Amino acid sequence: MSFSSAQESHQHSLETLELFYSHPDFMESVDSVCDIGCGKEAFDLEWWATQEVDDDDVISPLNIKCTGIDIHNMILVNHDNITYKQHDFETLLDQEFDVLWCHDSFQYALSPMLALSNYYHMLTDGGMLALIVPSTTNLEYNKLAFSQPNFHYYNHTLDGLIHMLSISGFDCESGFFQQQLNDRWIKLIVYKSDVEPMDPKTTTWYDLVETGLLPVSGVESINKYGYMKREDLVLTWLDYSNIWYGQ
């Protein structure tokens, strides 16, 4: 875990979860959620399980069916809407969900491409994957700072994750992305497309352009240089702010 406590981790999650809550139509469309790497305290999972909707001043529970998976033998949350499965979060779980919530856990995947392919198959058609991943290369006090935490074997970047997600069949053209300057957290919200995961050994940038899965600014960069440059990216976040990553 990248935080000093589970509560601190949950507070960080709420920055994104509360943006979801500000879109009631989206929340009401969600029937099932899987929290990948939910942790023993499972605060994020409990958040999903206890959400309510205000319909003409009548408060009603959404009753989202929630599944948590992690390597622990138990979690500390007990709720009728929550099911827990002891399971590693790289291999395929034989169940489909509307939302996969993956906060501060994907960085531990030993085979990230395989994990993303499995996540694709764990989603319902058009389902949403939310990845929130720490970067190990960051700007601190106008200098590059490098870190290598325990069990982090990949240096994930925003553009690298978009590359992997699109190869894995996720729609990044319609996705939402954020990595603020001086913020080590990369946030990606993408959707399962009707394009099956492709072979990462043979799929080129131009192949990805043909699928329509890449952000428009990424396609423009590829058409200009033959590959995607981070400084060309202009991406939208959940609050509909546009961020240029060339600054």
Predicted regions and their residues:
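Short catalytic micro-motifs in class I SAM-dependent methyltransferases
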Residues: 104-107
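A conserved beta-strand element that flanks and buttresses the S-adenosyl-L-methionine
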Residues: 101
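Conserved S-adenosyl-L-methionine
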Residues: 170-181
